[in-house]
Amino acid sequence: MNDLLKYAIIGVSVIISVIVLSFAITYYGRSRDVISVTGLGEEYFTSDQIVWTGRIRVDAYNKQEGYKQIAANQKKVAQYLAENGISSQEVTYSFVEVDKQFESVYNSNGNYAGSRFAYYTLSQSFTISSNDVDKVEVISREISSLISQGIDIESWTPDYYYSHLDDLKLSLIEKASKDARARAENIVNNAGAKLGKASTASLGVFQITSATGNDEYSYGGTFNTSSKEKKARITVRMSYKLK
């Protein structure tokens, strides 16, 4: 009786082991009937928004006189911008910043003896945001002509943006998805198999770089603002079942 029970237990164990092994083999086979590919979507585009910043600066021994001078210069800048087609709604002026400047003092022996107040430096930044990219580009280059009127003015390189990024992203995702499927079909057809439906999909990082530059792609995403002509790209990781 004990032998019969022993053989019965062994028999049941063997059956269970076979069932588990068969399931594992079937699952492994099914998991291999999948192909994963990465598709790329790229598109070149031209920025349609520009943001440009400049700064007016005045040096004065008297703070009140400095405010008067910078107000007069700001008026000339506003007039120049208006004459060149920039509306007041497109310009933002910052608060006037005031900094004390000091000069070194030396004793009769030529040794450093400390510092003393020399003059005030007052500065005011202005920023232009516009959809007329070409016009603002010209102004940013030619505004230095105000120097001949006694205005100390600085100009920074403009930043360029695009107002239809959401539409661009959707277009890139569509292109990347089609590219992924084309790649998968090419691989599968060469292997004599057939491609089924997509099982999983994941997006890569959205990148915007200069169209002609050598910007480096970043793991967290690149967003170039220094170039008017840009290139956008995104990758899509797709997995397809095989028929």
Predicted regions and their residues:
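Short, charge-dense linear interaction motifs
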Residues: 1-243
